[in-house]
Swiss-Prot record:
Lineage: superkingdom: Eukaryota
Taxonomic lineage: Eukaryota, Viridiplantae, Streptophyta, Embryophyta, Tracheophyta
Effect on the protein upon substituting residue 123 to T: In cuc1-1; cup-shaped cotyledon and abnormal SAM
Gene: NAC054
Organism: Arabidopsis thaliana (Mouse-ear cress)
Name of this protein: Protein CUP-SHAPED COTYLEDON 1
GO cellular component, one term: nucleus
Tissue: Expressed in inflorescence stems, rosette leaves, aerial parts of seedlings, flowers, floral buds and roots.
Induction: By BRM, at the chromatin level, and conferring a very specific spatial expression pattern. Directly induced by ESR2 in response to cytokinins. Precise spatial regulation by post-transcriptional repression directed by the microRNA miR164.
General remark: Overexpressing transgenic plants exhibit adventitious shoot apical meristems.
Annotation: DNA-binding region: 119-178
Amino acid sequence: MDVDVFNGWGRPRFEDESLMPPGFRFHPTDEELITYYLLKKVLDSNFSCAAISQVDLNKSEPWELPEKAKMGEKEWYFFTLRDRKYPTGLRTNRATEAGYWKATGKDREIKSSKTKSLLGMKKTLVFYKGRAPKGEKSCWVMHEYRLDGKFSYHYISSSAKDEWVLCKVCLKSGVVSRETNLISSSSSSAVTGEFSSAGSAIAPIINTFATEHVSCFSNNSAAHTDASFHTFLPAPPPSLPPRQPRHVGDGVAFGQFLDLGSSGQIDFDAAAAAFFPNLPSLPPTVLPPPPSFAMYGGGSPAVSVWPFTL
């Protein structure tokens, strides 16, 4: 690798510029495009480099340019000759078969970072499909670089041709076409409507689920066998009446329930009814049958008084 010194500017130059080193990326600044590349092309029309192709932009559509570029993923660089509309005029022909390039905004000055002197100008153009003035704006953007100021052609050489320009073409990111917007809006509306209808259908189910229940004591439980799942909510627990405090000996003598003469057993049913008068009784189907066991060595079944099993 040697160093090519040109007009006070030094840059490394590979002996075989067609073979780029691994990881090489071509991202020059505006000043570098003017001083390292366009100026050399203007002085020597045979000048070429590994990163910039030479094309006729009037015979190429913007979507064809990435394939004609030597390198680049989002930006592509080209040398091209200006096509004058008239031999003696200054207006440039920027039309292709499918459309035309239209300038937008003001030209931007490119100055030296060291001396602040003017080196060139940058023009921004947008590609329109169709013919003016009814062309359809596209996402393709081109920045056209030309020499100016201290690098003006009459300062360089009388034999230099000012038709050479350097162009950077890119596809503007984040731009969505009209068709894509329509599809996206219709899709989002359909999805929103679907969720809205689903939500309205689920709402009564949730309301029913929250309000309906079947009592465990209902005689119509068989009628709800095929009902939806929300009918199987458990009923709230029954509220027990407040118990009245009683003391042994207050109006009821516990001994009166002893019947030792006949069977030698205690009448627990009568005792429970006397001591717990407000205790609710439940149907026998609610509680499992009480276990049987012998009391005092006898064979009689145990007496069950809810909630006690003896």
